[in-house]
Swiss-Prot record:
Assembly, per entry: Homodimer. Heterotetramer of two MnmE and two MnmG subunits.
Name this protein carries in UniProt: tRNA modification GTPase MnmE
Record: residues binding K(+): 236, 255, 257, 260
UniProt gene name: mnmE
Cofactor info, note text: Binds 1 potassium ion per subunit.
Enzyme class at the top of the EC tree: hydrolase
Species per Swiss-Prot/TrEMBL record: Burkholderia lata (strain ATCC 17760 / DSM 23089 / LMG 22485 / NCIMB 9086 / R18194 / 383)
Coiled coil segments of this chain: none
Domain TrmE-type G: 226-386
Amino acid sequence: MLATDSDPIVAIATAAGRGGIGVVRVSFGRGGEAAALPLIDALCGQKLAPRHASYVPFLDEHGAPLDRGIALYFPAPHSYTGEHVLELQGHGGPIVMQLLLQRCLDAGRGFGLRLAEPGEFTRRAFLNDKLDLAQAEAVADLIEASTEAAARSAGRSLDGAFSRQIHALVDDVITLRMLVEATLDFPEEEIDFLEAADARGKLAKIRAQLAHVLGDARQGALLREGLSVVLAGQPNVGKSSLLNALAGAELAIVTPIAGTTRDKVAQTIQVEGIPLHIIDTAGLRETEDEVERIGIARTWSEIERADVVLHLLDSRNGMTADDETIAARFPGGVPVVRVLNKTDLTGVAACVEHPAAEGDLTEVHLSAKRGDGIDMLRAELLRIAGWQAGAEGVYLARERHLIALRAAQEHLAQAADHAEQRAQSLDLFAEELRLAQEQLNAITGEFTSDDLLGVIFSRFCIGK
């Protein structure tokens, strides 16, 4: 906890720009009631009943109204931050909001009121045990949600669904640790611990439970982050037409002239609530045109960062020598789907062909021009992403959550190995359980550095 975490803070809590309502929020920190009551009197000219909406004038330093609106006073600990909080809801014009903000700062100068940093109100809520860290992150995720599914999942995380799963895992790990460490503390008790306490059975159940949580978290991360899909291939194979077909709109220029697309064209579409970030790129070929060469270099950069590459071919020509050269340069760790476009010119029915042998690629035959096979391609992208259609109860998760869950999974696997070696490895068994617990606690913030908190809350908007 930093020294500044107890400062009184103020910020405009609503989005920039004009609106029907604007909100200025004050959290009084260490100032408490001694700071709150004089500020309320200076701004509102009267006392406020706790947790009641009062329609009052917002007064300047001379007692003249700056605005009129709703004032709400929340004494600690019954507030968003867990501190004494004042919210002033006025008209949402930027000038009015700035005047009201400055009035708060001037009136609160005597007790050290300052502007809040990004995410500082939610940071206070975390530090005062109103939210755990996973719930605090869900606040930002709910604000930033780009799909209905992502918003609903963020709401479940904010409600504590993810945190409850983590706490249940931690409780089970702690229970098992207690059994192991009790045996280590009393070696004179000649009890076969592993058999009597069914330690291996308990560990197996914890590992299965963790695998389930990790699976749900992967689904949640997919809802939050989406999938980056790069369209790559030679010129004139229909990449821009495919982008337009996937998006359902004319986003990219389509002509028979090779090299029309010289820089990337990106569009995010939603498929079953999953954001697919589709990137149309310059056609891959040898060229003397400097502008086109720059576009091709950017294409390869996008391919290296992609989650999936769609390698487009002209179905009339199949896999040519130039296509083989392109395919040989694809990064080894990036999934590639071979898309044979223009089936309207060959008479081949739209279909998906999954690999018959290891090392082969999935092939999708389609016509971007007519739209044949586009739904099949969307379904294939979701399959590659690992999305389970109709998954209920998914909560939004972040990459740091996945990293912590995978690390905990690895520590539990090591613990299982030590359990198989029986009593001679009980101390190592206990240590791996401790490390797994540490990783799980980091998700909810029970074991977290100030540096990590700074990174997480700096990404919030000011006033939240």
